[in-house]
């Protein structure tokens, strides 16, 4: 590069954002160009070879009982029994051993609904 170009580049490096914006506006007015069209064209050309990765949506979920406050244990126990079909003793053991997986392989809607039921009863649940 010529010394003149090098000096211009060094001067541009010292500009603030406001000064750079004013410079772009002045160049657009002086030379009758549109910098936004050139910038977007460059972005499109640079982005063209990028490979688009497909994001696979999860279809099966596991329902985890994360936490049960002591004062909400009975309400959560009832919900766990209705969701799992467990007997009283088994459901009680499951609730008391939180965090614990309650159900696995649920569809998205069923998992969300079960999570809402546990949370409505006062427990904390998550989907994995």
From Swiss-Prot:
Disulfide bonds: none annotated. CDD domains: Ribosomal_L7_L12. Keywords: Chloroplast, Plastid, Ribonucleoprotein, Ribosomal protein. Gene3D superfamilies: 3.30.1390.10, Single helix bin. Its main location: plastid. HAMAP family: Ribosomal_bL12 (MF_00368). Forms part of the ribosomal stalk which helps the ribosome interact with GTP-bound translation factors. Is thus essential for accurate translation. Belongs to the bacterial ribosomal protein bL12 family. This is Large ribosomal subunit protein bL12c.
């Amino acid at each position: 590069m010529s010394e003149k170009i090098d000096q211009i580049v060094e001067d541009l490096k010292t500009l603030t954002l406001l000064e750079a914006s004013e410079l772009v506006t002045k160049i657009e007015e002086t030379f009758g160009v549109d910098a936004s069209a050139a910038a977007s064209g460059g972005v499109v050309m640079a982005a063209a070879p990028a490979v688009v990765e497909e994001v696979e949506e999860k279809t099966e979920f596991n329902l985890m009982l994360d936490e049960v406050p002591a004062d909400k244990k009975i309400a959560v126990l009832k919900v766990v029994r209705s969701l799992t079909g467990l007997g009283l003793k088994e459901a009680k053991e499951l609730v008391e051993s939180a965090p614990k997986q309650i159900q696995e392989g649920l569809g998205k809607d069923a998992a969300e609904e079960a999570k809402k039921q546990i949370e409505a009863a006062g427990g904390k649940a998550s989907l994995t």
